Structure formats: C-alpha cells, structure tokens
Amino acid sequence: MHSLINHNEKNIGIFLFLIFSILICSNAHSDQSVESIIMVRKALFSQNYKTAKRVQSLSVSGNFDEAKNLMIEMSKNYQVLLELFPDNSKEGFKTRSLPIIWEDKKLFNALMQKSSDDMIKLTSLIESTDDPKGTIGKLMWGNCKACHSKYRVEN
C-alpha cells in the first residue's frame, strides 16, 4: 500500500510538472515584451521588402537560383509573422498595424499564409514564365499591396 501511495505521488508530481511546462510554453509570446514583438515583426516586414526588391532584380536578370532561395526565405518569414500579432501588441512602439488585423484575425492570417504559399509557388513558376516581372507582380507584390492597403497605416 505504501508503494502505491509513493507511486501516485510520483505520478501527480510528473502530471503537475507537465501541465506547468505546457502552460509556460504556450505563454511564450505573451511573456515576451510588446516592444520586442513589434520590433521583430517590423524588422521581418522590412527584411521581406528588401528581399522582394532583390528577388525582382535577380529574376529579371535571369539569376533564378539565387532568387528562388530568397523566395523561400520570404515564405518562411511570412510563417513567422503569423505568430507575431498577439492581442497585447495592438498598439505602441510606433506600430503601423491597423486594429482590423485583430478584429478579423482569420482574414489577416489567411493573407499571410497566402503570401507564404505564393512565394513557394513563385519558385516553381519563375523560370518557365514568359513574363517574370508580371508573375512577380501578381504573386509577390500583389500580396504586399493587399496587406498595406488593408492592414497598415498610410504614410
């Protein structure tokens, strides 16, 4: 009987440790400071813009391998951005994000996912298209424009 009690105490301890660990991991972004979240997402959007300009330049000049690597990098950045709009980051620290992002989070997330998917799609189309600039305009710049026109404060 004594070993059964010890066994149950051990199981309860393990269970509580696992629950505590899950709670800690799931709150990782909420514990992160609002400022750092906003700064990281601003940096990623800025990086994607710079990378997009480079993608266009490389693609138009026929350097498709390097352009494809950058497209994949941009796609990954959009995936990261999906996690960088928690409720506690709606305002402050010169964010240029509009409240509509949080009001219709599913639509915003769908656009970020589409942007990521379109960059991957672009890697398979860029070499075979007759109009690299037009294809890039549709699959890359079109998503940038859609996001800026709906979710970003105007300049």
Task: Indicate residue ranges for each PLM-predicted region.
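Histidine-centered active-site/metal-ligand motif
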Residues: 29-31, 148
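Bacterial N-terminal signal peptides
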Residues: 15-23
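N-terminal signal peptide c-region/cleavage motif recognized by signal peptidases
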Residues: 25-27
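A short, amphipathic alpha-helical segment
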Residues: 2, 53, 149-152
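The canonical Cys-X-X-Cys-His
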Residues: 139-152
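Bacterial N-terminal signal peptides that target proteins for export
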Residues: 2-15
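Extracytoplasmic c-type cytochrome modules immediately beyond a signal peptide or single-pass transmembrane anchor
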Residues: 32-138
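Short Cys/His-rich "knuckle" micro-motifs
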Residues: 155
